Amino acid sequence: MVESGAAALAAVMADDEDMVRIEQALIRLEQAVASNSLGVDEDFDFHLAVAQASKNQFFVSVLASIRPHMEFGMNLMRNLSLSKTGERLVRVQSEHRDIVKAILQRDPLEAETVMRRHLQETRQRMFGS
């Protein structure tokens, strides 16, 4: 998975500005969620900030090229499950915080692991329930 590799590389390659961008992207996402927004753009921007911090243009390009598909999937999942959206968003935000924590701690193995888990959980939320 591209994003797992990007998270691992971000934990190693990110400079201070990248770290701030990732944290700010998470804050914007949390603000969107707190205001009852679906936060689709903010969610994508968080993942893009991680990819950019990897300093690997391949990861950034792949993520940018699949943006419409990711946004469609996020919108579909969140709109079809509005009754569960609150609890799901709390869980998703926890997963995002775990990703940020691993990157800030410069732990590539943990960053890769928590990103992979987040993507697996997302797939399960989308198709498994």
Q: Where are the regions a protein language model picked out?
A:
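Conserved amphipathic alpha-helical segments that form helical-bundle/coiled-coil interaction surfaces
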Residues: M1-M77, E95, E110-E121
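C-terminal-biased regions
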Residues: T85-L104, P108-S129
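Short amphipathic alpha-helical segments at helix-loop
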Residues: Q31, L80-K84, I103
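Extended hydrophobic/aromatic segments used for targeting, binding, or gating
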Residues: M74-L82, G86-L89
